[in-house]
Amino acid sequence: MMRVLQATMLMVCSAVTVAGTKQIPAAIAAPAGEKLVLKAHATGFQIYTCNAGADGTQQWTLKAPEADLHNKKGAVIGHHFAGPTWKYKDGSEVSGKASAHVDSPDPDSIPWLLVSATGHTGDGVFAKVSSIQRINTKGGKPPAASQCDAAKTGTESKTKYSADYYFYAPSK
């Protein structure tokens, strides 16, 4: 009986569920000691550039995101751009670096991420953000590899995407 209870608890603790989303894998769960401070829905583009990779083959590489952040009523409350960086309507910004990722449940969509903050600007909502999750992604993958050849070197392509971003800050 104890082993059944332990197995059940392991399954429950291996993923976190946030209201209104699919199950969030433990690999991208917000660190302990952080609280959710803002949810935003992003709509925009992932911008890719066709260039030669390290092995000499042509490939699409991510240049930058370009998206608006919306509140639950659909109003624009900020922007997401190269860095990656998120800017809130109060002027505060947070930049970060992906620290973990999992494949999206939708194979035609970019991965879900956990991003660790690396820098801040301003004193507003994003001033103390320490982690950002990107979940519920739709679209955003690069064009087909066949569309990136030597003749297209330097060409940019914008792919539509949407995602939910959850911003976390220390609980204290």
Model-predicted segments: where are they?
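Functionally constrained cores in energy, signaling, and assembly domains
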Residues: 6, 17, 40
